[in-house]
A protein has these predicted regions:
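Ferredoxin-type iron-sulfur electron-transfer modules and their immediate structural context
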Residues: 370, 374-375, 380-460
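Generic long, charged, amphipathic alpha-helical segments
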Residues: 309-331
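Catalytic cores of alpha/beta
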Residues: 48-54, 211-215, 327, 340-359
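Active-site entrance/lid segments in N-terminal catalytic domains of soluble metabolic enzymes
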Residues: 1, 6-16, 20-21, 25, ...
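C-terminal helical cap(s) of enzyme catalytic domains, especially alpha/beta-barrels
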Residues: 72-92, 363-391
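Short beta-strand/loop segments at the ligand-binding rim of alpha/beta enzyme cores
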Residues: 32-38, 282-285, 327-337, 446
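Glycine-rich beta-to-alpha transition loops that act as phosphate-gripper elements at the mouths
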Residues: 41-44, 291-293, 333-346
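Glycine-rich phosphate-binding active-site loops on the catalytic face of alpha/beta enzymes
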Residues: 58-72, 229-231, 348-378
Length: 460
C-alpha cells in the first residue's frame, strides 16, 4: 500500500482519494462517523484489501460480509459460478462469506488495523472516523454455534485475539516505514471493533425466529441491532404492478415468497417490542431496507433456478418499504438503507433521514470503488443528525422513482459490454473503451500518461 501510494498516488488502483471534512462528522451507536455511506455486505467487504480500497475511495460505514455456521468449501460448493451479473439491473446467486469464519474475522481485523493507519498516514480523516457493522445469519442455532459466537465476541473486543496482537506487533515493528503514523498511534488503536449488528435471515424465516435472534443479540450480546427486511413486505400485487409499470415486466416471480416471508402485520408488533427492549438498554434499534429480491432465472442469466435482484429495479421496491415503515412508525423507526442506492438517489435518501446507506450494485459497475468518491463528495454538507424520518419526503421518493430515467427500464436495451475474446485468467478485465475503439487505441494508458504529465508519451 505504502509503495503503491508513493509511486502512483493510488491504493489498490483507486485513483482518487476521499478526504473527510473533520468539521462535518456525524455520530451513530455512540461513535464518530465521517460520512454515512459505504459498501454493503457482499463482494466488496469480504477481504481486508476490499475494505482498504473502499475507505480510500470514500466509504466510512462498512457492512461486513455475512458470516454463518456454514462456511469454507462446504459453502462454496453450494454456490454456482458465476454468481453475479450486473449489466443493467443486477442479479446474484451468492450467499455469505466463502471463507471460514475465523478467516473472515482475520480479514476484518486486518482491515480495521489498516484503515486506522492509512487514515492518518495519507491524511484521509480521523483514525476513529469510520465504523464496521457485523452481518450475521441465518438462524439462532447457527448464531449460537461456537465459531459464530467466538466471531461475535472477538469482533466486540478483539484486544486479546491473536490476529489483533499480531497486526499491532507487525505495525510497531515497521513503524519506521511511516511518515506520520507513530508508535503511540498504533498503540491507541481500539480493539472494540463492532458494537452494531445487522441480522440477515433466509427467505421464509418465521417471525418468531427473527425476534429470538434479535432478542439474543440485544439482551445477551449488547449489540445495537438492525433487522434486514425483505421487499416482499409490500405484497405481490404492489410489487408486480410496480415492476410492470416501470418496464420490468420480463422479470419473473410468483407469490410464493410473498406468502412465505415475514408478513407486514406480524412485522409491526415485533418491531415495536424490539424498540422497547432496546430503549430499556440504551441501545439503538432499526431495520435494514432491504434484502435482495428473489426472482426466477428465465434467460440463463446465472447457472441457478432462482436468483436475487438488486440495483436500479430494486430501488422502487426498497424505497416503498422504507416509506411504508416511516409512515406507520411516525418516522421514529431508524432505517439503514441498501436497495439500489446510487449517485442519483442517495442525496434524497439521506435528506429524508434514512442512513447509513450501503451499496453493492453500483460499485459492481465500471468505475467500481472510485464511484464512492463521487458519492461521498455529494454529502459534503453539515454532518447529518438523526432526528427521525420524514415520511413526506419518502413518499416523494417513491413517486419520483416510478418515472425516473435512472430507474425505469430503457426502451432500447443497453449494448453489451462483454467481448467475444478469451480474457486472461489473472487481471482479466479488458477496458471496453479500448475494444470498442475502431483502431483499438490504448485509451487507459493514454489517460494515465496525461494524468502523470507525460504528454509526449501519451501522443506516441
Amino acid at each position: 500500500i505504502l509503495a503503491e501510494h508513493k509511486a502512483t498516488g493510488q491504493v489498490f488502483g483507486i485513483q482518487k482519494a476521499y478526504v473527510a471534512d473533520l468539521e462535518k462528522t456525524t455520530e451513530i451507536f455512540g461513535r464518530k462517523l465521517e460520512n454515512p455511506v459505504g459498501p454493503a455486505a457482499g463482494p466488496h467487504t469480504q477481504l481486508a484489501q476490499n475494505l482498504v480500497a473502499a475507505y480510500y475511495a470514500g466509504a466510512r460505514f462498512f457492512e461486513l460480509k455475512t458470516v454463518q455456521k456454514m462456511d469454507g468449501p462446504e459453502l462454496s460448493a453450494c454456490i454456482p459460478k458465476p454468481c453475479i451479473v450486473a449489466e443493467d439491473e443486477a442479479y446474484n446467486c451468492e450467499w455469505s462469506t466463502e471463507l471460514y469464519v475465523p478467516q473472515a474475522m482475520e480479514e476484518y481485523i486486518k482491515g480495521w488495523m489498516a484503515l486506522h493507519v492509512i487514515s492518518k498516514e495519507f491524511g484521509l480523516g480521523s483514525m476513529d472516523g469510520f465504523q464496521f457493522n457485523i452481518s450475521v445469519g441465518y438462524d439462532l442455532a447457527g448464531i449460537k454455534s461456537e465459531k459464530v459466537d467466538t466471531f461475535l465476541n472477538t469482533m466486540q473486543h478483539a484486544q486479546d485475539s491473536e490476529i489483533f496482537k499480531h497486526c499491532k506487533a507487525y505495525l510497531l515493528e515497521h513503524v519506521d516505514l511511516f511518515e506520520k503514523v507513530t508508535a503511540e498511534d498504533i498503540e491507541s488503536i481500539s480493539g472494540d471493533i463492532c458494537n452494531s449488528v445487522t441480522i440477515s435471515t433466509l427467505h421464509g424465516c418465521p417471525p418468531e425466529e427473527i425476534e429470538k435472534i434479535a432478542m439474543y443479540l440485544i439482551t445477551e450480546k449488547g449489540f445495537h441491532t438492525f433487522i434486514k427486511c425483505n421487499p416482499t413486505l409490500l405484497g405481490y400485487e404492489y410489487a408486480r404492478k410496480t415492476m410492470d409499470d416501470m418496464g420490468y415486466d420480463y422479470i419473473a416471480f410468483g407469490d410464493f415468497h410473498f406468502k412465505d416471508d415475514l408478513q407486514y402485520e406480524d412485522a409491526v408488533p415485533m418491531l415495536n417490542r424490539l424498540i422497547a427492549v432496546c430503549q430499556e438498554r440504551n441501545l439503538e434499534f432499526g431495520v435494514k431496507i432491504t434484502n435482495t429480491f428473489p426472482v426466477d432465472v428465465k434467460q440463463n442469466e446465472l447457472p441457478s433456478e432462482e436468483m436475487y435482484m438488486s440495483g436500479k429495479s430494486l430501488y422502487p421496491l426498497s424505497i416503498s418499504v422504507a416509506n411504508m415503515l416511516a409512515r406507520d412508525f411516525g418516522g421514529k423507526l431508524r432505517i439503514s438503507y441498501s436497495g439500489g442506492a446510487d449517485f442519483h438517489n442517495i442525496e434524497g435518501i439521506i435528506d429524508a433521514g434514512i442512513w447509513p446507506v450501503t451499496m453493492a450494485t453500483t460499485i459492481l459497475k465500471p468505475g467500481g470503488y472510485d464511484r464512492l468518491c463521487q458519492i461521498a463528495g455529494l454529502l459534503e454538507k453539515e454532518g447529518v443528525v438523526f432526528t427521525g424520518i420524514d415520511a413526506a419526503k419518502t413518499e416523494k421518493l417513491v413517486e419520483e422513482a416510478k418515472t425516473s430515467p435512472y430507474h425505469v427500464k430503457a426502451v432500447k436495451p443497453l449494448p453489451s459490454r462483454k467481448i467475444n475474446k478469451q480474457v486472461p485468467l489473472i487481471d482479466c478485465f479488458i477496458a471496453p473503451c479500448k475494444e470498442g475503439c475502431p483502431i483499438h487505441q490504448d485509451i487507459t494508458t493514454y489517460l494515465q500518461l496525461v494524468e502523470a504529465g507525460k504528454y509526449e508519451e501519451a501522443m506516441d
